Design a protein with these regions (language model features):
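Amphipathic alpha-helical scaffolding segments comprising HEAT/armadillo-like alpha-solenoid repeats
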Residues: 289-292, 319-331, 351-361
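Flavin-dependent oxidoreductase catalytic cores
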Residues: 188-198, 208-211, 299
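Short, charged low-complexity linear segments at domain edges
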Residues: 163-188, 216-235, 286-290
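Auxiliary alpha/beta "docking" domains used to position bulky ligands
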Residues: 1-192, 240, 357-379
Length: 379
């Protein structure tokens, strides 16, 4: 084992190693999240976490990283870009017959990749310390990763509650490495949102109820990924063709003009998930679903909820007799799916009877214009 390094030198080496491992930025902070505890408790008290009971169950543990790994003194916070080339944001959103999947989920599940890189970083640090305990986290334990990233200088919290970076926007994953050595800490950066409320006004379902506060129960990401039961009827028409997650609050953000493309091949879109036809997706058997989503974040919602989400999107599409036939073909498979199919069929018939050729969603039309003008590379 080599001689222990000066902590300032070690911190610089850690940041360099992080870049070599594929992270775009590395910051260091202490474990004090006491300022976040009242906000977290107020959010939970308002039931904004919906059916994510584990969030309430873990309570304030999320704001106390030192309790996850006793002896923890510092948190090394990292970010990794995930935006793929040819993201096709606007072209997918404005085509109702296509299914929109949040761009972070088009490739391989990020959890394992980031965790392995963080583990390697911990092992590299270990080689330069007499002793070191470390533990990597990637959205996998009760930890407030965004406040930690903010304290570590990776960016500031936007009004949509995501971390924003002046040079990279918000299309990146976060990860943490807890360590028990007193490394020098980084300073937070100045926030850059000012009076802008674009993310709040563009949200299809009005889920950003006040600056920095998201009511998950209205968020399309929650509805399509976390919610296990029926999607509230009043929110279904607002979901459009989004079948797994939603990127609207990021796409409207001016800072994402500076978003950087990923350098990771694992985050490249899988062909069956990139601008897919809704009718084709709705025809997938469970076997096909499991095969296509192997190693993907999408797999965890299961085939039933996948079909539930697509049924809603088909219900939101313009009248098409092939859609009606597709919906009819899956009746009787499960009560949850049947309920959403019945709703979708009713929507289709209503449009047929009213001769509605196109469903107008002003927010979506505005978003598409903004993307095509401000993010031409990714439109």
């Amino acid at each position: 084992m080599s001689e222990p390094l000066d902590l300032n030198q070690l911190a610089q080496k850690i940041k360099q190693w992080g870049l070599e491992l594929g992270f775009q930025q590395v910051g260091i902070t202490d474990t004090d999240l006491s300022a976040s505890e009242p906000k977290l408790q107020a959010w939970l008290d308002k039931q904004y976490h919906g059916e994510m009971d584990w969030m309430a169950r873990h309570g304030m543990l999320r704001a106390r990283p030192h309790e996850l790994l006793p002896g923890t003194l510092r948190v090394i916070s990292v970010r990794m870009n995930y935006l793929p080339a040819n993201a096709a944001f606007a072209s997918t959103l404005k085509t109702p017959k296509l299914g929109y999947v949040s761009r972070y989920a088009l490739g391989r599940d990020y959890h394992k990749l980031l965790r392995n890189r963080l583990k390697k970083l911990g092992e590299m640090i270990q080689q330069h310390c007499v002793s070191l305990n470390f533990r990597p986290f990637v959205d996998s334990a009760p930890i407030l990763e965004r406040p930690l990233a903010e304290k570590a200088g990776l960016g500031w919290t936007g009004k949509h509650s995501l971390i924003l970076n002046r040079e990279a926007g918000s299309f990146f994953f976060l990860g943490e490495l807890l360590v028990d050595i007193p490394l020098p800490v980084d300073q937070p950066v100045e926030e850059g949102c000012g009076k802008c409320v674009a993310c709040m006004t563009i949200c299809p379902t009005g889920a950003i109820v006040e600056p920095y506060t998201v009511d998950a129960r209205r968020c399309i990401s929650y509805l399509t990924i976390e919610l296990e039961g029926a999607i509230p009827v009043e929110l279904r028409p607002l979901m459009g063709n989004r079948i797994y997650g939603c990127d609207d609050c990021q796409l409207i953000c001016p800072w994402n003009r500076y978003s950087q493309l990923t350098t990771e091949d694992d985050f490249s879109p899988r062909k069956p998930l990139h601008a897919p036809e809704l009718i084709e997706l709705f025809a997938w058997s469970e076997e096909k679903f499991l095969k296509v989503t192997e190693g993907s974040a999408i797999r965890r919602i299961g085939h039933l909820r996948w079909l539930r989400n697509i049924a809603v999107a088909l219900g939101n599409a313009p009248w098409d007799e092939t859609i009606l036939a597709a919906l009819e073909s899956r009746k009787g498979e499960h009560p949850l799916l049947d309920e959403h199919i019945a709703w979708a069929i009713a929507q289709q018939i209503e449009r047929r009877n009213a001769s509605i050729v196109e469903v107008q969603l002003p927010k979506k039309q505005r978003l598409v214009r903004v993307i095509e003008k401000g993010l031409p590379r990714d439109a």
